[in-house]
From Swiss-Prot:
Pathway the protein takes part in: Nitrogen metabolism; urea degradation; CO(2) and NH(3) from urea (urease route): step 1/1
Record's protein name: Urease subunit gamma
Keywords: Cytoplasm, Hydrolase
The protein's assembly and partners: Heterotrimer of UreA (gamma), UreB (beta) and UreC (alpha) subunits. Three heterotrimers associate to form the active enzyme.
């Protein structure tokens, strides 16, 4: 299988997000890379599903809570920016204060 660097990056994000989901399901608190991967994957998949940028910006704030992540992670993740592919092209999705 021959993947472009962009495709490799997307695949890595989804693998990391899958691991984060498993750890979260086991009751473990997520670290910074795991939380970032989970949020990024949520935004990429939402764009693929045809959700709007505005909808994803709002919904992205409800993916994780402070109880889901390790201490200090919410402060490190002031915002998450993802270039996502929507049905009508690629757009930048920014979620400010993603961890409520």
């Amino acid at each position: 299988m021959l993947l472009s660097p962009h495709e490799q990056e997307r695949l890595l994000i989804h693998v990391a997000a899958g691991l984060a989901r498993e750890r979260r399901a086991r009751g473990l608190r997520l670290n910074h890379p795991e939380a970032t991967a989970l949020l990024t994957s949520f935004l990429l998949e939402g764009a693929r599903d045809g959700r709007s940028v505005a909808d994803l910006m709002t919904a992205g704030r409800g993916v994780l809570t402070r109880d889901d992540v390790m201490e200090g992670v919410p402060e490190m993740l002031a915002e998450v920016q993802v270039e996502a592919t929507f049905p009508d092209g690629t757009k930048l999705v920014t979620v400010h204060q993603p961890i409520a």
